[in-house]
From Swiss-Prot:
InterPro entries: Ald_DH/histidinol_DH, Ald_DH_C, Ald_DH_CS_GLU, Ald_DH_N, Aldehyde_DH_dom, ALDH7A1-like. Homotetramer. (S)-2-amino-6-oxohexanoate binds at residues 331, 489-490. The lineage of its organism: Eukaryota, Metazoa, Chordata, Craniata, Vertebrata. It comes from Bos taurus (Bovine). GO terms for molecular function: aldehyde dehydrogenase (NAD+) activity; betaine-aldehyde dehydrogenase (NAD+) activity; identical protein binding; L-aminoadipate-semialdehyde dehydrogenase activity. The active site is at residues 296, 330. Multifunctional enzyme mediating important protective effects. Metabolizes betaine aldehyde to betaine, an important cellular osmolyte and methyl donor. Protects cells from oxidative stress by metabolizing a number of lipid peroxidation-derived aldehydes. Involved in lysine catabolism. It is an enzyme of class 1 (oxidoreductase). Pfam families: Aldedh. Residues 1-26 form a transit peptide. This is Alpha-aminoadipic semialdehyde dehydrogenase. Coiled coil: none annotated. Its EC number is 1.2.1.31, 1.2.1.3, 1.2.1.8. PANTHER family: ALPHA-AMINOADIPIC SEMIALDEHYDE DEHYDROGENASE.
C-alpha cells in the first residue's frame, strides 16, 4: 500500500479484468505496455507496437513517430507514426473526393451508416473505454461513459437525419414559394483535446456525417492511440457499406497539422476544442480566409449556493464538479460561491467529503479519482497553488503532489481569496476549487459573470423568482445555466458550448446541426408573371 501525504483517504479497490501493474516502478517495466500480457486486450482494438496515424481510405504515415504514455505510471504504451505535410495534402484531397460521394447519399441513409457506427462502438465499449482510461487517465467508469456518449450521439443523429431541413415561408408575391434549403458545408475539420478524446469527436462526427459532410480528425498527440482505435472502428463500418474510408479521415499530428487545417480553404468548417489561447490563434487564421470555425474553449465555471440551498445537493455536486476527471473537464467547477450564512458549514462538509475520495488505479471499479494527464499538468497545478497562496489564499485541503508513481495530485480547496484575484480569473486545468463568501444575489451574479469565459454555471436555491432571474438577461451569461445540479455532466440533447472567451460554438444537440450546414434562401416562381418584391414597378 502506497502512502499519500495530507488527509486523503486511500482505499484498496477491486481490480477490473483489464487491470495491469499500475504501481510498479519504471525499472521493472522494460517494454511497451502493449507487449506485456496484462495489456494484450489493446490488440482487440487493432493496435500494435507501432501504429499508422494517417487514414484516408488506407493507413499510413510518414511523419514523426511519437510514444504515448499512461498517466497513472508514466510508462510507454505504444507508438504512433504521425502525418507529414505530404500525408496531410493527400488526405485532404481524398476527403474532398469522398465528400462528393457521401453528399449524394440521402440523409436517412447517412443516418443508417451512423447507426451502424454506434452499434460498432457498443460492441467495443468496454475495451475502448479501458483505452481511454489507460491513455487519458480518467477513471474507468468515465472512460466507458465517454464511449457511451458517442453511442448516444449516434442514436440522436439517426433520428435527426430524418428531420434536418428548413421551413417553407409565406411569399408576399402570388405564384411564388419561399423556402430555406440546407446543404452540407463540405469538409469538416475536427481538432479535439486530450480530456474527452472520444466524446467530443463523436459530437462533431456523428452530426456532421448525417448533414452530409466528410470529416478530417486531428486528435491530441497524447491520446493518439485513442484516435487510431476509434478510426479503425469507423473505417470498418464504411468499408462494409462500400463507402470511401476518407469520409472519416485521420491525420495524427501536432501544431503543424492543426495550423494547416486552420489555414486551408478546403476545410469548410473547423471545429476546435482546446485552450482559449490556442483557440484565439485558430480563430484568427480561419477568419483571415473567411472560413467558419466552431470553438469550444476554456471555462471558469462557478457554483453558487444561497442560504436556502439544500446542502445535501450542494456538497456532492461541488465534489463531483470540482474533482471529477481530476479537474480536467471544460465544465469543471473552479469557483464556489457560498452565502455567508452557510459558508463555514459547507466548507467543513466538503473537507470531510474530500477525505473520502477513493484514489488509485483508474481501472479499479471503486476508484473515483485518477491522475492528471501529464507531468506538465502537475507543474501547472503546483504553480497555481503557490500563486493562490501569494495572493492571500489559504489551502484548507490538499495542495500537494501525491507520493506515488504517475501524475497524481491532491484535490485542493482554497479559501480567503478575493473574488477578482488574478489566479481566480485564470483557468487552471486541475482539481483546485476556490471558495468565497457572498452577501446578496446581485453581488454574486456579477461575480459569476466577471470572468472572461462563459461556459457553465449553476445555482442552488429553492426561490423560484431567483431561479428565473438567474436564467434571464441579467442572470448568468454562460452557455450552460443550471439550477440545483453541478456545472458538469451535460446531456447530449442540448447544445453544448459557451459565450465570450469560451468561443461561442455549439455542439451536439438542439439546433447545433445548423453549424455543419450552409443555408440558402430560395424563391421559386411557378407563375407566368414576374412581380417584384416590395411592390416595386420596373417597366
Amino acid at each position: 500500500m502506497w502512502r499519500v501525504p495530507g488527509l486523503l483517504c486511500v482505499r484498496v479497490a477491486r481490480k477490473s479484468k483489464f487491470s495491469g501493474s499500475w504501481n510498479r516502478p519504471a525499472a521493472f517495466m522494460s517494454t511497451l505496455l502493449i507487449n506485456q500480457p496484462q495489456y494484450a486486450w489493446l490488440k482487440e482494438l487493432g493496435l500494435r507496437e507501432e501504429n499508422d496515424g494517417v487514414y484516408n481510405g488506407s493507413w499510413g504515415g510518414r511523419g514523426e513517430v511519437i510514444t504515448t504514455y499512461c498517466p497513472a505510471n508514466n510508462e510507454p504504451i505504444a507508438r504512433v507514426r504521425q502525418a507529414s505535410m505530404a500525408d496531410y495534402e493527400e488526405t485532404v484531397e481524398k476527403a474532398r473526393e469522398a465528400w462528393s460521394i457521401w453528399a449524394d447519399v440521402p440523409a436517412p441513409k447517412r443516418g443508417e451508416v451512423v447507426r451502424q457506427i454506434g452499434d460498432a462502438l457498443r460492441e467495443k465499449i468496454q475495451v475502448l473505454g479501458s483505452l481511454v482510461s489507460l491513455e487519458m487517465g480518467k477513471i474507468l467508469v468515465e472512460g466507458v461513459g465517454e464511449v457511451q456518449e458517442y453511442v448516444d450521439v449516434c442514436d440522436y443523429a439517426v433520428g435527426l437525419s430524418r428531420m434536418i431541413g428548413g421551413p417553407i415561408l409565406p411569399s408576399e408575391r402570388p405564384g411564388h414559394a419561399l423556402i430555406e434549403q440546407w446543404n452540407p458545408v463540405g469538409l469538416v475539420g475536427i481538432i479535439t483535446a486530450f480530456n474527452f478524446p472520444v466524446a467530443v469527436y463523436g459530437w462533431n462526427n456523428a452530426i456532421a456525417m448525417i448533414c452530409g459532410n466528410a470529416c478530417l480528425w486531428k486528435g491530441a498527440p497524447t491520446t493518439s492511440l485513442i484516435s487510431v482505435a476509434v478510426t479503425k472502428i469507423i473505417a470498418k463500418v464504411l468499408e462494409d457499406n462500400k463507402l470511401p474510408g476518407a469520409i472519416c479521415s485521420l491525420t495524427c499530428g501536432g501544431a503543424d497539422i492543426g495550423t494547416a487545417m486552420a489555414k486551408d480553404e478546403r476545410v469548410d468548417l473547423l471545429s476546435f476544442t482546446g485552450s482559449t489561447q490556442v483557440g484565439k490563434q485558430v480563430a484568427l487564421m480561419v477568419q483571415e480566409r473567411f472560413g467558419r470555425s466552431l470553438l469550444e474553449l476554456g471555462g471558469n465555471n462557478a457554483i453558487i449556493a444561497f442560504e436556502d440551498a439544500d446542502l445535501s445537493l450542494v456538497v456532492p455536486s461541488a465534489l463531483f464538479a470540482a474533482v471529477g476527471t481530476a479537474g480536467q473537464r471544460c465544465t469543471t467547477a473552479r469557483r464556489l460561491f457560498l452565502h455567508e450564512s452557510i459558508h463555514d458549514e459547507v466548507v467543513n462538509r466538503l473537507k470531510k467529503a474530500y477525505a473520502q475520495i477513493r484514489v488509485g488505479n483508474p481501472w479499479d471499479s471503486n476508484v473515483l479519482y485518477g491522475p492528471l494527464h501529464t507531468k506538465q499538468a502537475v507543474s501547472m497545478f503546483l504553480g497555481a497553488v503557490e500563486e493562490a497562496k501569494k495572493e492571500g489564499g489559504t489551502v484548507v485541503y490538499g495542495g500537494k503532489v501525491m507520493d506515488r508513481p504517475g501524475n497524481y495530485v491532491e484535490p485542493t480547496i482554497v479559501t480567503g481569496l478575493d473574488h477578482d484575484a488574478s489566479i481566480v480569473h485564470t483557468e487552471t486545468f486541475a482539481p483546485i476549487l476556490y471558495v468565497f463568501k457572498f452577501k446578496n444575489e446581485d453581488e454574486v451574479f456579477a461575480w459569476n459573470n466577471e470572468v472572461k469565459q462563459g461556459l457553465s454555471s449553476s445555482i442552488f436555491t429553492k426561490d423560484m423568482g431567483r431561479i428565473f432571474r438567474w436564467l434571464g438577461p441579467k442572470g448568468s451569461d454562460c452557455g450552460i445555466v443550471n439550477v440545483n445540479i453541478p456545472t458538469s455532466g451535460a446531456e447530449i440533447g442540448g447544445a453544448f458550448g459557451g459565450e465570450k472567451h469560451t468561443g461561442g460554438g455549439r455542439e451536439s444537440g438542439s439546433d447545433a446541426w445548423k453549424q455543419y450546414m450552409r443555408r440558402s434562401t430560395c424563391t421559386i416562381n411557378y407563375s407566368k408573371d414576374l412581380p417584384l418584391a416590395q411592390g416595386i414597378k420596373f417597366q
